[in-house]
Amino acid sequence: MDNGSSVRGGRPWLALLVISMFLQASCSSVSQTRDALRTAEVCCDDFAAMSFPAIHSVNPSDTPVVVELNDRSPVYSFSTGKSYFSAYALSHGQPGSDLLLMFAPGRFNALNSGTFCPIVTYLNSQHEPIASEDLVIRWVSADQSRSGYWTAAQTVPAAASYLIVHTSDEMLSRQLSIDAVTENQTIMVGYAVATIPVTRAAGYQCLPVGEVQVILLG
């Protein structure tokens, strides 16, 4: 007897139960990351009290600076909302250059996933925030699948002396969408389970934690 076909054909409720459990676990994970940020203590009262290690410029083929924000990262209450952050000092020649951020979906499980959605705050030499252009976010994928990453490009303001990578309340209220994603989907056909290719949009909830690669082009 084929035990696998017995499960697929005779117990459709089992597949539905597993799907329900995955969805509950993913929602719980999203909620837990946000609750941890909400209750975390801020590191300092102003920008001047932050630590600013130097950030090096790289060529496109070089290894980027990897920023990983999690519940062990410092926290600050920005004007855009409370966030984990990573701060850097700019050296001579870096203001006015191009900044490229690269980040990818981070799965909680196969059915639901999220991604860290970065923004950048620039400070002048007096640790005062200065205006900058909006980040332009694009999805990059060779085969129109979930195997890809986002890029966010920006020009570093000429007056900038420091940069801070973090997120915002506005970002955390959003989803980043990918159009025309093709993936296999499991459906119920009578009492049987079938897998079919489906092309649709995919949405990724913005999270306060995750990893982003920072490329400051020299």
Kindly give the residue locations of the regions a language model identified:
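Bacterial N-terminal signal peptides
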Residues: A15-Q24
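Short amphipathic, basic-aromatic surface patches that mediate peripheral association
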Residues: P95-L111
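Bacterial Sec signal peptide processing site at the extreme N-terminus
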Residues: C27-C43
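Noncatalytic modules at the cell exterior or secretory-pathway interfaces
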Residues: P95-D98, T155-S177
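Edge beta-strands of jelly-roll/beta-sandwich modules across compartments, strongly enriched
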Residues: M171-V189, P197-L216
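Non-catalytic, beta-strand-enriched accessory regions in extracellular/secretory proteins
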Residues: L69-G93
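Bacterial N-terminal signal peptides that target proteins for export
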Residues: N3-L14
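Short coil-to-beta strand junction motifs in C2/discoidin
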Residues: L111-P118
